[in-house]
């Protein structure tokens, strides 16, 4: 698969936006065009960002993607019953999926919560990679994990660009 979804999953106010802010090293919002994501001082990939989750916005993810067939999509996803519709869109459109689950999230209790929606077997059964991180902790190390994953995936597909 030559398309990648990096999803940050969590409850409302779990740290999804903080993750994107840390990854881009600045405040970012959903845009209408592709943007550069620097993976180090000189190398970058071109990505499409959906910062506010489709679930919170009450919109289908395809309504939020305003460019044709982006190779890399970064998308916030909210842990609620309709989130699988968002993942199904990416599965049905040939995306490899990496899910960065904030569990517990920043505003959750201190305990990891049970996957009551059954997302784990559905995602893993469709070949997704799933990691779980504490959204209450400093995002530096988990964001570095995202950066390294994107770099490796993009390098293999010759999608790394440089200034």
Feature roles, as predicted:
Residues 1-3, 70, 94-96:
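A general structural motif
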Residues 28-29, 155:
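A generic secondary-structure boundary signal that marks alpha-helix termini
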Residues 29-92:
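Conserved nucleotide-sensing/catalytic segment adjacent to the nucleotide-binding pocket
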């Amino acid at each position: 698969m030559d398309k990648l979804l990096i999803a940050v999953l969590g409850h409302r106010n779990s740290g999804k936006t903080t993750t994107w802010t840390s990854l881009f090293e600045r405040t970012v919002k959903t845009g209408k065009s592709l943007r550069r994501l620097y993976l180090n001082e000189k190398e970058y990939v071109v990505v499409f960002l959906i910062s506010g989750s489709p679930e919170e916005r009450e919109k289908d993810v395809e309504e939020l993607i305003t460019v044709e067939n982006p190779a890399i999509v970064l998308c916030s996803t909210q842990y609620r019953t309709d989130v699988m519709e968002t993942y199904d869109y990416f599965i049905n459109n040939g995306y490899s999926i990496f899910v960065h689950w904030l569990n517990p999230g920043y505003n959750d209790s201190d305990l990891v919560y049970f996957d009551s929606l059954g997302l784990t077997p559905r995602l893993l059964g469709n070949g997704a990679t799933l990691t779980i991180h504490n959204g209450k902790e400093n995002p530096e190390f988990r964001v570095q994990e995202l950066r390294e994953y994107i770099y490796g995936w993009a390098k293999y597909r010759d999608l790394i660009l440089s200034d």
